[in-house]
Amino acid sequence: MIHCKVQQWSPQYLRLPATGYEELTLTLNTSMLARMPEEEDQLFLVVGDSPSSTYVDWGEDCNSTRYPSYDHCTHKILYLGASAGTTRSKRLSATIGIRLSKGTGSNNVLGTPMYLLYNEMKTRIIESSK
């Protein structure tokens, strides 16, 4: 299971519908991102609740207007640091949009919990919500 450092955050999982696309907007506010260590500058969206879970491709801009279609599990990183042209102060509020569609076989994420994480060790900082 994914370790949750912030114990007061209760699990709220995103459950995708049985068919079609689901558009998500993840709003990261100051209190959430302030929990990230200063040296961290990237976020991961993980499908499932296991450390070995795969990642969703969702672009690399912290205010992305791109909505990649999800049809297979890929490992992509959302950068909130210099690579995205942001600074520590600018990253304290960000809204990210992604679009996911039904996968096939083991890549099917429908009804699967999703987590937004801030490091490779899979430390959870916030769960996704509709």
UniProtKB/Swiss-Prot annotation:
GO biological process assignments: methylation
E.C. designation(s): 2.1.1.318
Annotated catalysed reactions: [trehalose-6-phosphate synthase]-L-cysteine + S-adenosyl-L-methionine = [trehalose-6-phosphate synthase]-S-methyl-L-cysteine + S-adenosyl-L-homocysteine + H(+)
Source domain of life: Eukaryota
Keywords assigned by UniProt, alphabetized: Methyltransferase, S-adenosyl-L-methionine, Transferase
GO molecular function, one term: methyltransferase activity
Coiled coil: none
Record note on pH: Optimum pH is 7.
Transmembrane segments: none
Temperature effects on activity: Optimum temperature is 30 degrees Celsius.
Effect of a null allele: Exhibits almost 50% reduction in intracellular trehalose concentration.
Function: S-adenosyl-L-methionine-dependent protein-cysteine S-methyltransferase with broad substrate specificity. Methylates trehalose-6-phosphate synthase (TPS), enhancing its enzymatic activity and promoting trehalose synthesis upon entry of cells into stationary phase.
Identification of the protein by name: Cysteine methyltransferase
